[in-house]
Swiss-Prot record:
A GO cellular component annotation in the UniProt record: ribonucleoprotein complex
Role played: Binds directly to 23S ribosomal RNA and is necessary for the in vitro assembly process of the 50S ribosomal subunit. It is not involved in the protein synthesizing functions of that subunit.
Disulphide linkage map: none
Protein name as annotated: Large ribosomal subunit protein bL20
Highest taxon of the lineage: Bacteria
Alphabetically ordered keywords of this record: Ribonucleoprotein, Ribosomal protein, RNA-binding, rRNA-binding
SUPFAM superfamilies: Ribosomal protein L20
Family: Belongs to the bacterial ribosomal protein bL20 family.
Single GO biological process annotation from the record: ribosomal large subunit assembly
Gene3D superfamilies assigned to the protein according to its UniProt record, in alphabetical order: 6.10.160.10, Ribosomal protein L20
Molecular-function annotations in GO: rRNA binding; structural constituent of ribosome
Length: 119
């Protein structure tokens, strides 16, 4: 039986990892064993980061809505409850965008929320 040499596969595997480690410093870029560990850790951070990004943006939107609601004399929770009672179903992303780019529109929403809370 012929002897199987695995140089091609090893080269391909090493090249794949070293390409992923492009931009890293020192041995993390040049040495396969170290680069492999660095790439695995980077992929773990990337996976975790994709989950954290969702949390961070939701938190940012809530902060922006809260700031705009307080300018209009409402807390965040009372503003959201007022919108719910008024039957206005806008998500936090859209509300935050309105708060940043359309102050008059947000004030109108706040007035509707106040009206729904008073009723």
């Amino acid at each position: 039986m012929a002897r199987v040499k695995r140089g091609v596969q090893a080269r391909r595997r090493h090249k794949k990892i070293l390409d992923l480690a492009k931009g890293y410093y020192n041995a993390r870029r040049k040495v396969f064993r170290v680069a492999k560990q660095a790439v695995i850790k980077a992929q773990q951070y990337a996976y975790i980061g994709r989950k954290q990004k969702k949390r961070n943006f939701r938190s940012l939107w809530i902060t922006r809505i809260n700031a705009a609601a307080r300018i209009n004399g409402l807390s965040y929770s009372r503003f959201m409850n007022g919108l719910l009672k008024a039957g206005i179903t806008l998500d936090r992303k859209v509300l935050a965008d309105i708060a940043v780019h359309d102050a008059a529109g947000f004030t109108a929403l706040a007035e509707k929320a106040k009206g729904a809370l008073a009723a």
